[in-house]
Amino acid sequence: MTTQRSSGLLQRLVQGSLVKQILIGLILGILLALVSKPAAEATGLLGTLFVGALKAVAPVLVLTLVMASIANHQHGQKTNIRPILWMYLLGTFSAALTAVVVSFLFPSTLQLTTGATDITPPSGIVQVIHGLLMSIVANPIHALINANYIGILVWAIGLGFALRHSNQTTKNLVNDLSDAVTFIVKLVIRFAPIGIFGLVASTLATTGFSALWGYAQLLLVLIGCMAIVALVINPLLVFLQIRRNPYPLVLTCLRESGVTAFFTRSSAANIPVNMSLCEKLNLDRDTYSVSIPLGATVNMAGAAITITVLTLAAVYTLGIPVDLPTALLLSVVASLCACGASGVAGGSLLLIPLACNMFGIPNEIAMQVVAVGFIIGVLQDSCETAINSSTDVMFTAAVCQAEDARLAKSALRS
């Protein structure tokens, strides 16, 4: 009888909600880190394997899905990419503006020391744009190997349009290939609880949070900005699209996309998770197969917050006065920098010197600010990725649902 009960419990755990399984993995990871540090460090391999599997399958998934959706696209069918792109840009700018307001209300200062990183940041916005343009014309094999999603998108779109003129057998083959890759992705995602367990246990065992206490106020400002954007600004933008209570959708995206992104700390690795959630929400495949990988490269609200908050912290530390027009200009610059973050090694942190340059802050000091960013990266990068990645699904779903509602109203009127 006891054996039957235990096997029944195990079966419910295995076949139950993935979110609940991830929560169990999270709790077990914390407990293991508290009980045995060496064992927790050893489980880091599970997390590394999970993130590696997601990163490996994501480029192929994007290529096949986009190629298949465009190749099989019916003439006259609407994909809603333009309004989604506008929401991405508006969301990123709103996040930067929020960070400016919060930084004005709660100014933070830094303890600057000697530079702690030898990574070379881009010298200006021209170099960022140059990097993005070079990503567009990248070799397709190199783009797949290096997970260059801008290059992958360009090649997938080009091949998709070319395959529109092929016979139906070829189109079916491309579609079947896309379905096969999607099946592998679903298989990988089922291992998320084990991966999260390994990531949480090893992170707590190796780094802990003791190094973060010295930057408590800065972290509170950063995470506070991200919380405001996630729970106030984004729901407002979603409401303007769907014209009803946005929180069921917002909380679903945060729970099923944001949690995974928080622990993997990779928008690229979270693309398969987002694709799976879009399918679960019954969104238009032609739309989300393009908007999700596009969002992973240009929808960077979290990055805009990081760039703005750390730049203003450096400004306050050095006693540089900031007026309202300059703060607004910083919001624009931070938004542009954030959109280019995917094309820069080191992401948003390495674009801080570019924003600091607005205030005449020397590169040596700006790189010290970057070093602070790396110190708080355990939380900063996790929260940033969670808000970036969950917003990709959120805005895609909002636009798709708004379009479905519009079509339903039109059908009723006619």
Swiss-Prot record:
The keyword Transmembrane applies. One of its GO terms (cellular component) is plasma membrane. Keywords: Amino-acid transport, Cell inner membrane, Cell membrane, Membrane, Symport, Transmembrane, Transmembrane helix, Transport. It is found in: Cell inner membrane. Gene3D superfamilies: Sodium:dicarboxylate symporter (1.10.3860.10). One of its GO terms (biological process) is threonine transport. The chain crosses the membrane at residues 16-36, 46-66, 84-104, 143-163, 180-200, 219-239, 300-320, 332-352. GO terms for molecular function: neutral L-amino acid:sodium symporter activity. The keyword Lipid metabolism does not apply. It comes from the Bacteria. It is a multi-pass membrane protein. It catalyses: L-serine(in) + Na(+)(in) = L-serine(out) + Na(+)(out); L-threonine(in) + Na(+)(in) = L-threonine(out) + Na(+)(out). Pfam families: SDF (PF00375). NCBIfam families: PRK13628.1. Belongs to the dicarboxylate/amino acid:cation symporter (DAACS) (TC 2.A.23) family. Involved in the import of serine and threonine into the cell, with the concomitant import of sodium (symport system). PANTHER family: PROTON/GLUTAMATE-ASPARTATE SYMPORTER, SERINE_THREONINE TRANSPORTER SSTT. This is Serine/threonine transporter SstT.
